[in-house]
């Protein structure tokens, strides 16, 4: 698993890690059922604190992207289903993104084309 963290970013490391794992699942780089590195191993590989990785894994688990078993470690969930909470979160986040897009002068067609292009690169999602 290739993870690139920006230590100068205002985005916390645990959020960057969480986001990169989600995108890797979406792109198909991480497959459903695939094991993730242990917290210790990933922390060592990235040069970060184990608590940072643990926090990312905890968020991913609570969001349903991964499951964690004491004996077998963390793995990508084989069934990913959206809940009502996720749809509400998505609505809020899309409202913000669309507002920013419009305020920055990007036309709807250009935005939709960008979305289509990105969506087409996501080999790990069932569409």
Residue ranges: model-predicted function:
Residues 51:
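Key DNA-contact positions within bacterial/archaeal DNA-binding proteins
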Residues 14, 38, 72-88:
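Short, cationic-aromatic polyanion-contact patches
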Residues 95:
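Interdomain hinge/lid region at the active-site interface
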Residues 1-35, 88-89, 98-125:
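Extreme N-terminal segment that seeds HTH/winged-HTH DNA-binding domains in transcriptional regulators
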Residues 35-46, 60:
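A short alpha-helical element within helix-turn-helix/winged-helix DNA-binding domains
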Residues 29-30, 34, 61-71, 77-78:
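Beta-hairpin "wing" of winged helix-turn-helix
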Residues 45, 62-64, 104, 121:
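Residue cluster at the C-terminal edge of the helix-turn-helix DNA-binding motif
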């Amino acid at each position: 698993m290739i993870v690139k963290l920006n230590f100068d970013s205002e985005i916390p490391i645990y959020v960057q890690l969480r986001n990169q794992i989600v995108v890797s699942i979406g792109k198909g780089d991480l497959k459903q059922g695939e094991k993730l590195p242990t917290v210790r191993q990933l922390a060592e590989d990235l040069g970060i604190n184990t608590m940072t990785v643990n926090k990312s894994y905890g968020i991913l688990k609570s969001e349903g992207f991964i499951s964690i078993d004491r004996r077998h470690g963390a793995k990508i969930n084989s069934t990913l289903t959206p809940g009502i909470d996720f749809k509400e979160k998505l609505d809020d986040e899309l409202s913000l993104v669309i507002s920013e897009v419009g305020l920055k002068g990007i036309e709807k067609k250009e935005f939709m084309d960008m979305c289509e292009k990105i969506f087409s690169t996501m080999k790990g999602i069932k569409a």
